[in-house]
Regions:
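Walker A (P-loop) ATP-phosphate-binding motif of ABC ATPase nucleotide-binding domains
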Residues: 5
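Hydrophobic anchor at the beta1->P-loop junction of P-loop NTPases
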Residues: 8
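The conserved Walker
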Residues: 12
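Conserved lysine of the Walker
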Residues: 16
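Post-Walker A alpha-helix
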Residues: 19-20
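N-terminal phosphate/diphosphate-binding loop that engages ATP/GTP or pyrophosphate donors
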Residues: 24-87
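Phosphate-binding/switch loop-helix module in NTP-utilizing enzymes
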Residues: 76-106
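Phosphate/Mg2+-binding loops and adjacent switch elements
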Residues: 98-125
Length: 125
């Protein structure tokens, strides 16, 4: 099955995340299974110093899986490798009804499969 994708792109503080949030709320309330992908233009951490998973990464692990009875996550350290293209990330997602992608406006993903919402605001003068 081909993934259905909605892409949300625009300038910083233009309402992208708010739009994604409202789309996800509306669609999940209708019973759809939604996944999201957020492109970050900066480094980020989902674990913190002192946590076991942080210590595993600091020790040199390329991937660290953190698993509990309510969620799980895999943290992948690039360690100098190139950032993966959107398609690579999409292939790692579990099956769902729709993927909402925030960002990746410069990525060469298959835009024929994507409905793009472009969110723009006027620059303040």
């Amino acid at each position: 099955m081909t993934q259905k994708i909605i892409g949300v792109a625009g300038f910083k503080n233009s309402g992208k995340t708010t739009l994604v949030e409202k789309l996800v709320i509306a669609l999940t309330q209708q019973g759809y299974r939604i996944s999201t992908v957020k492109h970050a233009h900066h480094a980020f951490d989902i674990d913190h110093e002192g946590r076991d998973s942080f210590r595993h990464r600091r020790a040199g692990a390329t991937e660290v899986a953190v698993v509990s009875n309510s969620r799980w996550a895999i943290i992948h350290e690039l360690r100098g490798d190139a950032e993966p293209p959107l398609q690579t990330i999409l292939e790692k997602l579990a099956p769902c009804d729709l993927v909402v992608v925030e960002g990746y406006k410069r990525d060469a993903h298959d835009k024929k499969r994507t409905i793009n919402f472009i969110v723009l605001v006027e620059k303040k003068r």
